[in-house]
Amino acid sequence: MPWPWRRKSRRTLARIAIEGPIAGGTRVRVLKAIEQVQERECPALLLRIDSPGGTVGDSQEIHAALLRLREKGCRVVASFGNISASGGVYVGVAAEKIVANPGTITGSIGVILRGNDLSRLLKRIGIRFETVKSGLYKDILSPDRALSEAERQLLQELIDSSYGQFVAAVAAGRGLEEAVVRGFADGRVFSGAQALPLGLVDVLGDEESARRLAAELAGLDPEKTRAVTFGKPPRKLLGLLPGATLLQQLSQSLSLELAWNGQPLWLHRP
């Protein structure tokens, strides 16, 4: 049931930003921000997404929270920035409307799981692993050996299950048939302009266009409605240093490889 139009916050447009890879820290911050938006009964939410995606479970939890927020009567509009791919798309399709820049990189609908076979390197430097396990597949993706065909099949079934969940969410969120979504959900990326005729986005425009659309959907005057950001991402000290952007990118890439190795991901990885 929609919220009553009484509080001053009912004239406030909420804004939440998702920046960078979606993982545990992002999930905690965004879920808390969504809870604050619900408590203040803001009539609309502008969801700014600039993310290549991330872990499956974290993306699903944010998606589910956004759907619950909409059920409470909050109008949700997603604004895609430089990139909103893979898990960024999964989160975005929970919105009522999606606005993307013509040059936004989006799509990359699919699942990826990577592991490292370091057996030849380990043998060369004289390191050998000793493994005691409770079941045949307990050490699957162990770096000291290659995958067996049975293990590869097991992981493919896992990937296919996650992929099916992704396709179903996009189809439901965008009002498309699953067969149509599967036609372009093969990991390829699109510009915002290419995504429009596919039905992945509703409008081409910038964040201001998305803000105005969110206000209009909530019955507010776009000229008089201010946006208040909830759950601001913490500023990192690294960002204050010269050459910080490159350092952050390198640090981020290394962190992803170490932390997410062996996990199914909804992530665009060029």
Task: Map each language-model feature to its residues.
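N-terminal organellar transit peptides
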Residues: M1-G87, V91-N101, I112-P270
